[in-house]
Amino acid sequence: MTKDQIKKPTFKENVDSFVTQTSKIIRFPKDVIEYIKCGHSVMQVTVGVKIKNTIRNFIGWRAVHSEHRLPSKGGIRFSSNVNQDDTEALAALMTYKCAVVNVPYGGSKGSLKINPNNYSEKELRAITKNYATKLAKKGFLNPALNVPAPDIGTSEKEMVWIMDAYRNLFPEDINYTACVTGKPV
């Protein structure tokens, strides 16, 4: 078999492999480990935004690995190098990080396939708000269930835009400011 024919494991497969190896050391039952490795849900969205008289489409994801403890917590990443597998792997890692230090959150992660440096602030605001609206309408953005934070390619600015999108959808939610962390103080 040549080097090119060898299939490299995906990021998610690597994460699952580490969990399996660890389970043997700590002697967790195999069925429990298989359940732990399964993600709860993942949503793919297409974000369409009019930019310079053309509709541009961006693919995004929000993965929820665990809802064992709520809310699920994890960043939103804007990068041209994201995909569903990586998003799910990062959500799983968030679950494990929270569990190891006994922080009462499940794990989640979001991503949008975009190079944010290629867009003006006005364009990026429209893209971010559209993405946030799609997440919120499906329950993937909610102060009690799923709370994003900044990650690669996002900052407190995007978190404010996400909070604004959530507040516009759910003006009756008095806890709307808790729908994201990483906002300016």
Segments predicted by a language model, with ranges:
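Charged, low-complexity, helix/coiled-coil-prone segments
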Residues: 24-38, 65-80, 109-110, 139-149
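Short, Gly/Pro- and small/polar-rich lid/capping loops
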Residues: 2-46
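Glycine/serine-rich phosphate-binding loop and adjoining beta1-alpha1 elements at the start
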Residues: 79, 99-185
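Glycine-rich, N-terminal phosphate-binding loop and its surrounding beta-alpha-beta segment
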Residues: 43-118
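Amphipathic, alpha-helical segments enriched in basic
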Residues: 3, 7, 11, 24, ...
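Generic recognition of stable, solvent-exposed alpha-helical segments in well-folded globular domains
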Residues: 14-17, 82, 86, 126, ...
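Hydrophobic, Leu/Ile/Phe/Ala-enriched alpha-helical segments that form helix-helix packing faces
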Residues: 19-26, 91-94, 131, 135-139, ...
